[in-house]
Amino acid sequence: MQKPTIFKNKTLLDPRYMPPLNKIIDRKREMSMILNRFKPLLNDPLNYSFRCIINGSIGVGKTLIVSRIAEKFMEESRNYDRNIEVVRISCAYRDEIQVMQLILSQLAKKGYNTYFPSRGVSYGELLMFLQNFLESNKMHLVLILDDIDRFVERNPKTTPLLYSLTRFNDALPYSLLSLILITVNEQTIAKIKLDPAVRDFLYDIIEFKDYDVNTLAEILKARANEALYPNVFEDDLLWMIAKISDGKARKAISILNSAAQYAFDNMEPKIAPEHVRIVIAEYKERAESFNVSELENLPHHTKIFLLSIVLSLKECGAVSTSMGKVMKYYKILCEEYGIKPKSRPSLNRDIKALQLSGFVEADVRNVPSGGRTTYFSVNLISLNKLEKELRSRLK
């Protein structure tokens, strides 16, 4: 029996995939700011340089946008016949010598004669070699240092790398180096600025804020349309993922990829909300110790109302369910467990407790027939698992 098809192009959901510049959603302001740092190099690359910090949480598009802007700039620089190169290095788990060796290695891959022995050389020798190479070729290098946080964590005081690169042009007759540092938290910036020798050169900071839910849903929709076949996902599912991704595009795309893989592996015709709950629950248990033992803290009646939400969601198979549908199951369960049902207004305390516990999200929406009602969703745990755990505690 042939498996149903989910993926049209799975590589487009890989975290390493970088969409082209014209397909990047949002970040127009940040793209313009970064490009404005590059553009003066086209006029006079030997008498202009810049140094800036790109700061923002993991997964908000910093590396993607800096890399794509750098590519666009390099295309333009060829039209101007400028001798400019861009090199991006990940500083994670590397010391200053390894970083400098990687810079020279990247230049060698671009066809330049920057071979240098990998052993028995000091950082100072590597730095001098790079300076001499750029000066003799009258080349301007834009150096992008990614993952600088881990580098700074291992070096509480200013390292030779940061000091020498911020002052790289001081001993040269031309401006031959521009520097971009990519960081994920402001603590790193604070540590860098503790040293006045570096601080005065790194005042230019471009902030990448977390995405809002609407933008994340738009990013997911664009990526899903390219990576997945039509009719295997609903817009509500993408909205569900966007809401639980903490403003991080990388996390949202990873959740979508995992849920799609789960549907594919289980021969499902489409990605369901329950598939998202399953992969999120696995992630939570693995990374954040999210566990159902927190159910013990809920009052007996609140557990029954939560079970009502679970059963209603299982019946409709949707991302969320209405108060009216939940109340139908709530009355049945109250009879099953021999307790008196509360009135709708009296359930507000139970709803609040469930929201605070993290098991349930609730929001009030307009309904087509007029008026407003509460909708409930469960995002962080499989409905089957939650039902089993609740019933075992309600015996």
Where are these regions (language model features)?
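Terminal-proximal interaction/regulatory segments of ATP-powered molecular machines
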Residues: 313-395
